[in-house]
Amino acid sequence: MANPLRSEVRQLYKNLLFLGREYPKGADYFGERLKRAFMKNKDVTDPKEIKKLVDRGEFVIKELEALYYLRKYRAMKKRYYEEELSTMLNIG
């Protein structure tokens, strides 16, 4: 693997591992799947193919971030809007 791509792949792995800490099925589950995915592609040597895989990994990062933001939004909505609804019903 070429040096610049190697650093990109390592950074991608670290970022995914960090994001996996909050994965709904648990960090251990995510870590095992992540390791398996990277090990499956460890023999890829074509720089274009490696870049394509890195781009796919970055897409996964964006999807995970969206999942986490949605989960936080739902928790906040549940926390605040249910209180507001219950106070409105008590007033009326």
From Swiss-Prot:
Coiled coil regions in record: none
Entry keyword set: Mitochondrion
GO cellular component terms listed in the entry, alphabetical order: mitochondrion
Annotated function: Acts as a regulator of the electron transfer flavoprotein by promoting the removal of flavin from the ETF holoenzyme (composed of etfa and etfb).
Keyword Mitochondrion: yes
Gene of this entry: etfrf1
Family annotation (InterPro entries): Complex1_LYR_dom, Complex1_LYR_ETFRF1_LYRM5, ETFRF1
Similarity remark: Belongs to the complex I LYR family.
Protein name: Electron transfer flavoprotein regulatory factor 1
A GO biological process held by the record: respiratory electron transport chain
Localisation: Mitochondrion
One Pfam short name: Complex1_LYR
CDD domains: Complex1_LYR_ETFRF1_LYRM5
